[in-house]
Structures are given as C-alpha cells and as structure tokens.
Amino acid sequence: MAEDLDELLDEVESKFCRPDPLRLGTVERPRGGGGGFFGHDQNRAEAKENLRSAETFEKEDDLDSLINEIFEEPHFDKKHFKLKSKSSGNTSVRASIQGLGKSCSPVYIGGSTVPCGIGTNASPRACDHLRCTACDFWVESYDDYRWDKSCDYLFFRNNMPEFHKLKTKLVKKKGTRAYACQCSWKAVEELTDLQTDHQLRWVCGKH
C-alpha cells in the first residue's frame, strides 16, 4: 500500500511539481545526510496537499451528482422540497397541529337538509364524526330514512354497520336522517342539540 502511494505521489510530482533546475542547485543538501535534497521533500509535501485537495473536490463532485440524481427522480416533487428557516418551520408545524382534532361545540344532529361539518353556535352543523361512549362505536347516519318502530337493541348489535342488513329496518322519509350505533338509534328532521337528549351518549369524535 505504501509503495503504491509513493508511486502515485511520484507521478503527481512529475506532472504538477517539477522543480526548477536553477533552484535545485541552491537548496541541495549533502549526500551524506540520507541522499536527495530539501527541495524534493518540500515538493513531496506539496504534492500530498494537492492530492488531498483533489480528493476533496472529487468527493464534492460526487455529492453534487447524488443530489442532482435525487432531484431528477420521476416521483420527486420539487414543489414540496423547500428549505425553511427554523422560525417559519415551527410556525407551520404549530398551525398544522392546531388544524387537527377540532370538536363540535355544541354537538348537533339534524335532518338530511341540515349540512354536516364542525358545529358551533355561530355555524350550527350536524356532526358527522359522532362516537358513542357507551358501546365505543362510530355512529352511522342515513339521509332521507327513518328507523322502523320494530327496531330493538339486538338488531343494531348484530347488524351494525352493514347497510345491506340495516336497510331491512329503514323506511324512506324525505328530509329525515337516521342515526345509529350498536346500542342506540334515533331519526331526526330538525337541528337538535345532543345536550337536550340525555338518553344518547354520543359525542363528537373530532374532525
């Protein structure tokens, strides 16, 4: 390995670090001191430094090539690859967190004419992310239907949430929305605040 390195250094010296013949005569040292001359050692050190610089540039070129390959990937979207400052990044993350997990307040249900979404006092909407705290089941809703009077607990317990089974107890009624979980069911036409119905244990499961 050492011999290969010496050969490489000699080749670099011959190409890039040829000593000035006039200068060699002034810096030549006695042969008895191990042979050679001081200029030769200095040129060898310079060659090593040049070799290190060449290796550094080669690594930087390889890194640039790798980055270019990444950006040229067919599935890489440059629009989403943006470097942001630390402060702007924190702001974006904070805004994203605040945009998640919003709950209705108060929680409304309503007929098929009532729009669904996040309900508030200023913008009353029927919650479409209801969850029952009694059976721990998501509440399903069906527009323009009401439940047949023969419905019972076992029917919903055995058939939720498969619509092809539930529809045997669904009756068409324009403007009505039928709600049900595995333990409770209700059909309404008007906007209704769930706080007024103490039998239903439905809460907003967050949007």
Curated annotation (Swiss-Prot):
It comes from Bos taurus. Expressed in the retina (at protein level). May be involved in photoreceptor outer segment disk morphogenesis. One of its GO terms (biological process) is photoreceptor cell morphogenesis. Pfam families: RMP (PF14996). GO terms for cellular component: cytoplasm; cytosol; photoreceptor inner segment. Keywords: Cytoplasm. It is found in: Cytoplasm; Photoreceptor inner segment. Interacts (via N-terminus) with FAM161A (via central region); the interaction is direct. The lineage of its organism: Eukaryota, Metazoa, Chordata, Craniata, Vertebrata. This is Cilia- and flagella-associated protein 418. Residues 1-75 are annotated as: Required for interaction with FAM161A. The keyword Cell membrane does not apply. It comes from the Eukaryota. The keyword ATP-binding does not apply.
